[in-house]
Regions:
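Thiol-based oxidoreductase modules, predominantly thioredoxin-like and allied folds used
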Residues: 51-66
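Non-catalytic, surface beta->alpha helical segment in thiol-disulfide oxidoreductase systems
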Residues: 83-109
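Local sequence-structure signature of Cys/Sec-based thiol-disulfide redox active-site neighborhoods
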Residues: 15-53
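Flexible, polar/low-complexity N-terminal or interdomain linker segments that lie immediately upstream
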Residues: 1-15
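Thiol/disulfide oxidoreductase modules built on the thioredoxin-like
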Residues: 71-77
Length: 109
């Protein structure tokens, strides 16, 4: 039996992470040490919103998830934010939503 994950296994793992955590950010690096500017900006926006229950997933440590997350939401870039199981978007969308107050509303509800 191979230890390789099938694409279906990867999608199930992603689905569990998204559904079992209120706020999930798939990013490059960690909240403490982001490995790209976009991921760093995403973490800062969430901190500015007062998010304390942020679950991050470092896609650089898992190539299968790094590719699989792009298929999961049909979104080509990382970071990707999910709130209450719903795909929100990447760092640009997060910034726009933050500036308009929509992100704070989504996180508060």
């Amino acid at each position: 039996m191979s230890s390789e994950s099938t694409p279906d296994d990867v999608q199930r793992r992603i689905d569990e992470l998204v559904k079992n955590n209120r706020v999930v950010l798939f990013m490059k690096g960690t909240a403490q040490f982001p490995m790209c500017g976009f991921s760093g900006r995403a973490v800062q926006v969430l901190k500015a919103c007062g998010v304390e229950d942020l679950k991050t997933f470092n896609v650089l440590e898992d190539e299968a998830v790094r590719q699989g997350i792009k298929e999961y939401a049909n979104w080509p870039t990382i970071p990707q934010l999910y709130i209450k199981g719903e795909f929100i978007g990447g760092s640009d969308i997060m910034m726009e939503m933050y500036d308009s107050g929509e992100l704070q509303q989504a996180l508060a509800g």
